[in-house]
């Protein structure tokens, strides 16, 4: 993928990060998906006092995209203030395996806005559980 697409997607994730609602952890995360048609869809983490209700930036961006009819994702950028790059949690990895299995995932530190690490979804979640719709015994 062209470097300009990568830097543009990281920039979109960084802008989304500014809209994060993280009053408890103060760990703000932004995410941006790139579709094959070139559209960028973003999201930011939203926290709740009941931590189990908190939603990660990756899931917010994914749900935003899916509920607006967007799919066929080619890349995801995730940005936070994390020297080694903000790694997607297990729940986000599962949803990526289901809805964006061919996407390249870039993680970037918000201070430099350069990609720290790059992964395929299969590298993030090897042996992912994928149910077969309608499969029953």
Language model features: what each stretch is:
Residues 34, 63-70, 98-99:
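Alpha-helix C-terminal capping segments
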């Amino acid at each position: 993928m062209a470097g300009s697409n990568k830097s543009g997607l990281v920039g979109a994730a960084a802008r989304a990060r500014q809209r994060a609602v993280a009053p408890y952890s103060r760990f703000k995360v932004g995410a941006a998906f790139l579709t094959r048609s070139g559209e960028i869809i973003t999201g930011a983490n939203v926290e709740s006092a009941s931590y189990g209700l908190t939603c990660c930036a990756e899931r917010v961006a994914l749900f935003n995209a899916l509920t607006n009819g967007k799919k066929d994702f080619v890349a995801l950028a995730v940005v936070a203030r994390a020297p080694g790059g903000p790694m997607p949690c297990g729940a986000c990895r599962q949803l990526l395996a289901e809805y964006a299995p061919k996407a390249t995932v870039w993680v970037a530190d918000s201070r430099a806005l350069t990609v720290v690490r790059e992964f395929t979804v299969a590298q993030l979640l090897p042996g992912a559980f994928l149910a077969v719709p309608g499969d029953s015994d």
